[in-house]
Design a protein with these regions (language model features):
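A short acidic/small-residue loop/turn micro-motif
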Residues: 78, 159-160, 192, 220-228
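Acidic, low-complexity proline/glycine/alanine-rich linker and hinge segments
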Residues: 152-195, 233-245
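Short tight loops/turns at secondary-structure junctions
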Residues: 196-224, 238
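Short, positively biased Gly/Pro-containing turn/loop motifs at secondary-structure boundaries
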Residues: 226-270
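An exposed acidic His-Trp-rich patch
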Residues: 73-137
Length: 270
């Protein structure tokens, strides 16, 4: 399981990591794993400048891996400067940097021995995005398994998307017409829906294969209160449709365009 480095309500810029001389994005804040380090560092940041929503912590850390060890090389504080109307920053002075991280120093370097778990580094285009923390995926990702600052495992992935239908397309014009083609419900089977203008359902869980077949689909009818038969019919109708959009992410085919969507379905327009 990837480290839950911290939680954020909006998209966050990643840290920077250099591996074999290549600059990559580290999708997380490993400094936060040591609360003492984190709060000591925060106390050193300028207090008179507002942070930006894309970097609530107010800093970006720069890391590198050499001889299978994870090093923290520097920290850059960043804030919004209203005078120039831009994000500005500068590196924390070396004397301050080494004072904060002194307990992890080895010679003239900081070994990130407080870090254990899996961290994710990435490059390339974003293929999946949520406006929350580091919830996004790139074309090229590497999962590093870290034990007390030492790299003990590595898995590299080439992620991609296969086109097909996904519920985000319902935000386009003609959404209900499109939905009714995919989901032709037999409303006559449900007399309790005679006077209901619309129902709302949620796909709680979904699973797809590499060809866009929907293999598994768990549906909940949110409104109105209906029996399990309607939810089952919706699930079966969705599974009969093909192809669905497929995300291949870090070794798994995922139904990100289907799962956890809440969908309104118009029964009567009057």
């Amino acid at each position: 399981m990837l480290l839950a480095l911290t939680a954020y309500a909006t998209w966050q810029e990643g840290d920077v990591i250099y591996i074999n001389g290549e600059r990559l994005e580290l999708l997380g804040r490993p400094i936060c794993l040591d609360s003492t380090l984190y709060h000591t560092l925060k106390d050193e940041l300028p207090s008179n400048q507002p942070t930006v929503t894309s970097n609530w912590d107010g800093f970006t850390a720069y890391w590198s891996i050499n001889n299978d060890k994870l090093y923290l090389d520097s920290v850059r504080c960043e804030a919004y400067d209203p005078n120039v109307k831009a994000v500005v920053g500068k590196s924390i002075p070396s004397i301050t940097f080494y004072r904060i991280f002194n307990s992890y120093s080895a010679g003239n370097r900081i070994v990130a021995s407080w870090v254990s778990g899996k961290i994710r580094v990435a490059k390339g285009k974003v293929i999946y995005y949520q406006h929350s923390g580091f919830e996004r995926n790139y074309e090229e990702e590497t999962i590093l398994d870290i034990d007390k600052g030492k790299v003990i495992g590595k898995k590299e992935y080439h992620n991609f998307v296969k086109d097909g239908f996904a519920f985000d397309k319902l935000q386009e014009n003609g959404a209900q017409e499109m939905l009714h083609k995919i989901l032709p419900l037999h409303i006559e089977r449900y007399p309790e829906l005679v006077n209901v203008k619309r129902l709302i359902f949620r796909v709680k869980r979904a699973r797809v294969d590499e060809k866009g077949n929907l293999l598994e689909c768990n549906v909940q009818v949110v409104r109105p209160d209906a029996g399990p038969q309607l939810a089952t019919e919706i699930a079966e109708a969705l599974k009969n449709y093909h192809p669905w959009k497929v995300y291949y992410i870090n070794g798994e085919y995922r139904a990100l365009g289907i799962e956890n969507w809440t969908i309104p379905y118009i029964l009567h327009d009057k």
